[in-house]
Amino acid sequence: MDLGEIVEDVKREINLNEMKGKKISIDAYNTIYQFLAAIRQPDGTPLIDSKGRITSHLNGLFYRTISIIESGIIPIFVFDGKPPEKKSEEIERRKRAKEEAEKKLEKAKLEGEYREIRKYAQAAVRLSNEMVEESKKLLDAMGIPVVQAPGEGEAEAAYINSIDLSWAAASQDYDSLLFGAKRLVRNITISGKRKLPNKDVYVEIKPELIELESLLKKLGINREQLIDIAILIGTDYNPDGVKGIGVKTALRIIKKYNNIENAIEKGEIQLSKINFDIREIRKLFITPEVKKPTERLELAECNEREIIELLVKNHDFNEDRVNNGIERLKKAIKEAKSVEKQTGLDQWF
């Protein structure tokens, strides 16, 4: 679901330093997929250990998360639970797309097409249960808060933000706004110079901030109407949306008729084009399956032995680099906790 066109006027670049001392609830799966897609060898294949196991996600979680904490930010990684039944069509679509990419990847390898290899290697990326569990284990060893969502991780991260347990939710997807996040930060874990897909061009990617209240005020709508706009153009629960309706048309329709049902009643949208349950999908965004976290939401001291065991002994990471990372992490945690404490005190004066 891409609301990009209608958030353009309210999103702004935000420096990591502006988030110093603040907690950010991060959609873990979304972030790990970013690492798997972005952290690659020159030929486009992911980083692997001596046993052929993918390690791109661990590399990203370790080194890039350290950089985030060095900026004074306290990350909270939120992992997916069981997805809603309504998401099964989208999950199946993604599975087919990956299978197709895998076929094209093998063909590109046989033909020695390196640009195509890189392209399809990224498209074919998969996140296994083992990779998820290792990610949780690494984050825990690093002293970073981990929350297990009952349902969608993105919904839980947004909920944590909506009840002020974090300053913002972080994800590449705009769904966080539909789930009620007050603030959404994009590009927090992938900022810096990045190569454009299939091009020898590098661009500077910077974190972006979108505030829900500012967006709704700018558009002259409420959150439920924003959800209806998303439903019309397609969400994870109705991937195809309504044929022929883009985001600007959807905005015009909802502003004129207030909701999808009224637009159907007035003949603006043909009922025959609606092959999904509007109310059920709307409900999944308004009242998603979430819980108030019982997990620790503070940074803790890292466990050096467990980090070395997982990265160096199990996955062949360079020991000197990891030890250097651990020293950076220890210092960053100490400073981030100090900044958070001072930020909290400043609010009283």
Curated annotation (Swiss-Prot):
CDD domains hit by this protein: H3TH_FEN1-Arc, PIN_FEN1
Q: Which domain of life is it from?
A: Archaea
Listed binding positions for Mg(2+) 2 are: D173, D175, D236
> What binding details are noted for the cofactor?
Binds 2 magnesium ions per subunit. They probably participate in the reaction catalyzed by the enzyme. May bind an additional third magnesium ion after substrate binding.
For the ligand (Mg(2+) 1), the binding residues are D27, D80, E152, E154
Q: What PROSITE patterns does the record tag this protein with?
A: XPG_1
**InterPro entries annotated for this entry?**
5-3_exonuclease, 5-3_exonuclease_C_sf, Flap_endonuc, Flap_endonuc_arc, HhH2, PIN-like_dom_sf, XPG-I_dom, XPG/Rad2
Q: Where is this region: Interaction with PCNA?
A: 341-349
This entry's Enzyme Commission designation comes to: 3.1.-.-
Q: Which GO terms describe its molecular function?
A: 5'-3' exonuclease activity; 5'-flap endonuclease activity; DNA binding; magnesium ion binding
The family database entries (SMART domains) matched by this protein are listed as: 53EXOc, HhH2, XPGI, XPGN
Q: Which GO terms describe its biological process?
A: DNA repair; DNA replication, removal of RNA primer
- The annotated region (N-domain) lies at 1-98
Q: Main EC class of this protein?
A: hydrolase
Keywords from the named record? DNA damage, DNA repair, DNA replication, Endonuclease, Exonuclease, Hydrolase, Magnesium, Metal-binding, Nuclease
Q: Which cofactors does the annotated protein need, by name?
A: Mg(2+)
* I-domain: annotated segments: 116-258
Keyword Cytoplasm annotated = no
What is its biological role?
Answer: Structure-specific nuclease with 5'-flap endonuclease and 5'-3' exonuclease activities involved in DNA replication and repair. During DNA replication, cleaves the 5'-overhanging flap structure that is generated by displacement synthesis when DNA polymerase encounters the 5'-end of a downstream Okazaki fragment. Binds the unpaired 3'-DNA end and kinks the DNA to facilitate 5' cleavage specificity. Cleaves one nucleotide into the double-stranded DNA from the junction in flap DNA, leaving a nick for ligation. Also involved in the base excision repair (BER) pathway.
Tell me the HAMAP family matching this sequence: Fen (MF_00614)
Q: What NCBIfam families does this protein map onto? A: fen_arch (TIGR03674)
Which family is this protein grouped under? Belongs to the XPG/RAD2 endonuclease family. FEN1 subfamily.
Quaternary assembly: Interacts with PCNA. PCNA stimulates the nuclease activity without altering cleavage specificity.
Name of the featured protein: Flap endonuclease 1
What organism is listed for this UniProt entry? Sulfolobus acidocaldarius (strain ATCC 33909 / DSM 639 / JCM 8929 / NBRC 15157 / NCIMB 11770)
State the taxonomy lineage. Answer: Archaea, Thermoproteota, Thermoprotei, Sulfolobales, Sulfolobaceae
List the gene name. Answer: fen
